[in-house]
Amino acid sequence: MTEQQKFKVLADQIKISNQLDAEILNSGELTRIDVSNKNRTWEFHITLPQFLAHEDYLLFINAIEQEFKDIANVTCRFTVTNGTNQDEHAIKYFGHCIDQTALSPKVKGQLKQKKLIMSGKVLKVMVSNDIERNHFDKACNGSLIKAFRNCGFDIDKIIFETNDNDQEQNLASLEAHIQEEDEQSARLATEKLEKMKAEKAKQQDNKQSAVDKCQIGKPIQIENIKPIESIIEEEFKVAIEGVIFDINLKELKSGRHIVEIKVTDYTDSLVLKMFTRKNKDDLEHFKALSVGKWVRAQGRIEEDTFIRDLVMMMSDIEEIKKATKKDKAEEKRVEFHLHTAMSQMDGIPNIGAYVKQAADWGHPAIAVTDHNVVQAFPDAHAAAEKHGIKMIYGMEGMLVDDGVPIAYKPQDVVLKDATYVVFDVETTGLSNQYDKIIELAAVKVHNGEIIDKFERFSNPHERLSETIINLTHITDDMLVDAPEIEEVLTEFKEWVGDAIFVAHNASFDMGFIDTGYERLGFGPSTNGVIDTLELSRTINTEYGKHGLNFLAKKYGVELTQHHRAIYDTEATAYIFIKMVQQMKELGVLNHNEINKKLSNEDAYKRARPSHVTLIVQNQQGLKNLFKIVSASLVKYFYRTPRIPRSLLDEYREGLLVGTACDEGELFTAVMQKDQSQVEKIAKYYDFIEIQPPALYQDLIDRELIRDTETLHEIYQRLIHAGDTAGIPVIATGNAHYLFEHDGIARKILIASQPGNPLNRSTLPEAHFRTTDEMLNEFHFLGEEKAHEIVVKNTNELADRIERVVPIKDELYTPRMEGANEEIRELSYANARKLYGEDLPQIVIDRLEKELKSIIGNGFAVIYLISQRLVKKSLDDGYLVGSRGSVGSSFVATMTEITEVNPLPPHYICPNCKTSEFFNDGSVGSGFDLPDKTCETCGAPLIKEGQDIPFEKFLGFKGDKVPDIDLNFSGEYQPNAHNYTKVLFGEDKVFRAGTIGTVAEKTAFGYVKGYLNDQGIHKRGAEIDRLVKGCTGVKATTGQHPGGIIVVPDYMDIYDFTPIQYPADDQNSAWMTTHFDFHSIHDNVLKLDILGHDDPTMIRMLQDLSGIDPKTIPVDDKEVMQIFSTPESLGVTEDEILCKTGTFGVPNSDRIRRQMLEDTKPTTFSELVQISGLSHGTDVWLGNAQELIKTGICDLSSVIGCRDDIMVYLMYAGLEPSMAFKIMESVRKGKGLTEEMIETMKENEVPDWYLDSCLKIKYIFPKAHAAAYVLMAVRIAYFKVHHPLYYYASYFTIRASDFDLITMIKDKTSIRNTVKDMYSRYMDLGKKEKDVLTVLEIMNEMAHRGYRMQPISLEKSQAFEFIIEGDTLIPPFISVPGLGENVAKRIVEARDDGPFLSKEDLNKKAGLYQKIIEYLDELGSLPNLPDKAQLSIFDM
């Protein structure tokens, strides 16, 4: 009996034959058994061809121990002949091997947490410190090596190394191995053995009844529930309840499942875990759980050694119904002020969440009013339609006056002759209506000198706040004996006379003076005024700041004690004296000339913005709002979008204007002006907003409002202003998030913005309030008035608003006169050129079928636009590669939009136009047809056709909007973009806008930063919840890399969307759509004019070689050979360390090269297959790869591209409509319906094909794959036949990171470097991997007999590699750390004369010393001295 037979007998005896891999069962050997009768031990020596999966290893050990347990203690010693992937298996076996040591259970648990690194025969275990290293090394090194060797590992030694940076993320790769498999594998393997012995089928296979509600274990008593925040240590039995915010269900190799749920009760969050139990339907209960459901759970709280946090190992879990927040009011309110995630870094939920909640509460309508933008409108419309609620569209904008005066109450006074009173007030607060002057100081200036001073305190008869004392350094004691303000102001008025007032931020100071004068019966001041703050902003535009401190430094004026009136006044006076001289130089000589001569078009930048609410009343109002938004973002953007009052007045039709929040003009007026002025301002508005007192608490805390009583008085004045002006007063919530517990996310986002003024204060509770909550907030107004402003007025205002639709419901394409006729004529003209005047019927049928759909649905203009763009590029000498499915259209081929011919494979005679088509599916690509001559005239036949159905492009009915994506050369792309302006006009084309939101990784940083700043510790689950709360909020805007939106000539952009600059960059060359382009994708034409390296590389190859790329044969045998072997390059696999010759060929990265090695393609159609397989999801791995490995089918017959499905099924006999449905279902990852499966089986489609379809999640279009391969084959042609042209082009166009020191070495040295980097590949960073890619190409080039020279100061170009003999000379840009501008500068400096020394090089080209040292090491500076020697001729 052979040793292999012995192993099979053993496997049969311990009953695991059917559990082992076939290769192991057939090739395993039982080499000997060592028996010790004395010790009752048997040691089995077993040789295996490969490692057992860890779970199968434990199964084997359990089975053999159980079989012989009554005879002896059994151990096994394995030898593995093929140790491939030893490092992978070492990680999985790590826990088992640790268990074989004599360490304590606690220490074993600690050791299992450690990171493992396998390098050759050395195993490295990363530990936290030297104490651990010494302990583990002494305690288990020898026994751990022995345990690994017994498992078959070829290990020489184990090293325990310290790793100070051993953070949680470095352990992520061990989670599956340690936490889920290693911890459970022994138990799972035992259970598997028991199942096998019992020979019971899984009950879940026989009963698949769906579970509606999760209920596992015993009912949980509600009185045992405790808050999650109270769980701070391990406990035996705990019950909690919470809402699920994350759920992960994993299948283990044993077939069992583990569910990991993250729940929160909003006091804290916790991870809950549970394994499926034997013979239970737990899996179905797990599947019934989902995010948003509430559960009650009970179990053991323990420290999870992997995540280093407390988790609950559940014994019981049940889904519960949790009472949700209700709006119990009989009559509901309408919210008119609400911020979504589109309020940049401020609002939290998307509009859909608000709309759903409002609908659930029974609100009749809801508004959206994001800060400065309307980007939530498309989603708002969809959500309102879904939930049956009226959507009110609006925005909270920034209103500014068109010009902010510098001088008030102009006087006919010559500035140099005038007398000025420069004054300053210190007050108890900022409101001239509710606060008091405590100090009034002034200096009188004439002829450029201070001629008098005035300084008085006044008694406010109230204690000063600590804030005011700290700010002004005035104390209560200093004011006790001060005169009354009436006396001070009377004296001051007399002292001023008719002088011109001057103050820094004069509106503030004059507000207190005028209020005081009026209370004394004097009426407001009639003196002229000059505001030095606005004056500085106008005449010192180069300054970024204009505060008194800053200006004092700039003007050289001493400011000794800022915020004391007399010192501020004197400093302002001296600054003003110098400003008068500046005005004189600008031609401003009279007080009444200041505003006129110093005004400019940028005056809006100086104005202080006030918040304003704009509500769309009708469709005209929507368009006007779009115009306002656009102007604010494009024309009037200064730090923030601004709306000049004149702009609002121009486009006010169809809009309702509201007063907004405490930052609004009217609220400020109540604080600063008397009631008559307030009522005058109120008349400008259509409705007045008042918001809950809770939202204004911060104003009281910051002493901007004295107290609650004062706040209530402000409300009364606002209501009175509304009553007087005859406009409604409504209560609005200024909501920024849904529920109270969501507020933490807003705090985190605001805290992440150091310059945000909201950081200076405590954020109020800004949740979406119910009607009951709002009524309660305004109870102090009385029940009737509260109901009026909260319910009655909001509903009446909503009733005044018409139904508005912000998004069009159909496609509006541009018009091009004669497009239908031109596309038809062009298609047939080119078809006749190729196929002859007497067109084959298959050509006619395909053209007519396509043209009927294209012209009938108005798509001809889209084709014509694409044709013009491609033709322009071709005329300018740049090829264009098509993307997507456009190659499915024969009309696109005949109009030269794409080079891919979708007809079935066929021959065409270039002379007599004879053609022969292959319609039976026997040929994958026309390029694969054998060479053939024409039987009629003897000319070599052209081979064409990729067999791609048109239905894939425009849908089965031909009415799907065509999506024509084109790959232009990256360097030509801007020209193509600008050509659209020539075609349609500058005001008709815009870049497709995008919205960038906070990503999970970024949100994690925000959360950690916030918690650290606040000194708060939260467990991981709660951090995860907070991260989810911050994720998805708008952070910025951008633009699609190639998308151009085209507006038809009979409409304008505001019919579809506002416009803006990407990321508000006012220097951008293009404006973008304000809406994310996906929102209007079906309404306007989007051209995908993308940039790509391949066309650029083709252009360079053409320039170098003079070869027209279109003439390159696609079926060149030597070219095709490199996809399976490097022989045609004249190198061996060993020399270039690769089994193919595809280094640098498009779409041949490491993964795809492995696919090439596995499949060894020999035809164009097989390369198309590989392109499709490599771009799909679950198309290759675990699918086609296994089918090829097991021999079920070959590369040509697996499903590689989506179109293959339709073609294959039609050839199998299915109706085209059903074949199309199946293709669409599979490509979208939806699998197959029962009807589809039944139809496929009726037509004898094999089971493997059905199974393959069911696995696919996404699959690539064949036309796209064919276009990629066509470009790749052309580039490969140059690689094979014109190597130096290829390498020069590759390094110039595609490579970015170079190691020139290595590249100039001999081929053996380069190969050794590449080999070394391969051995360290898993540890390489991205930059090193990019360098490796370049060195792989260089190694190949060197072994083909070519070499790289060092940089040459005389010959190197700035950016391009140049050819010299059998060598390449690299450009300056290839030097690490040397940028584009410096590369240009070196060449420019060289043109002016040779470099005399390294010092000269540094001086002329601006090179850093490190760059010079690098060039020196490279050998690029031979005989160049450090410094130039002065000769007599230089004198």
Swiss-Prot record:
Cellular compartments annotated: Cytoplasm
Gene3D superfamilies: 1.10.150.870, 3.30.1900.20, 6.10.140.1510, Metal-dependent hydrolases, Nucleic acid-binding proteins, PolC, middle finger domain, Ribonuclease H-like superfamily/Ribonuclease H
Catalytic activity: DNA(n) + a 2'-deoxyribonucleoside 5'-triphosphate = DNA(n+1) + diphosphate
Pfam families given in the database record: DNA_pol3_a_NI, DNA_pol3_a_NII, DNA_pol3_alpha, DNA_pol3_finger, HHH_6, PHP, RNase_T
Keywords: Cytoplasm, DNA replication, DNA-directed DNA polymerase, Exonuclease, Hydrolase, Nuclease, Nucleotidyltransferase, Transferase
Enzyme Commission number: 2.7.7.7
GO cellular component terms listed in the entry, alphabetical order: cytoplasm
InterPro entries with a match to the protein in the record: DNA_pol3_alpha_NTPase_dom (IPR011708), DNA_pol3_finger (IPR040982), DNA_PolC-like_N_II (IPR024754), DNA_PolC-type_N_I (IPR028112), DnaE2/DnaE/PolC (IPR004805), DNAPol_HHH (IPR029460), DnaQ (IPR006054), Exonuclease_RNaseT/DNA_pol3 (IPR013520)
Domain Exonuclease: 420-576
Any one GO molecular function term: DNA binding
Principal subcellular localization: cytoplasm
Transmembrane segments: none
A Gene Ontology biological process term: DNA-templated DNA replication
SUPFAM superfamilies for the chain: PsbU/PolX domain-like, Ribonuclease H-like
Family matches, as PANTHER family: DNA POLYMERASE III POLC-TYPE, DNA POLYMERASE III SUBUNIT ALPHA
Protein family per UniProt: Belongs to the DNA polymerase type-C family. PolC subfamily.
Protein task: Required for replicative DNA synthesis. This DNA polymerase also exhibits 3' to 5' exonuclease activity.
Annotated protein name in UniProt: DNA polymerase III PolC-type
Record organism: Staphylococcus aureus
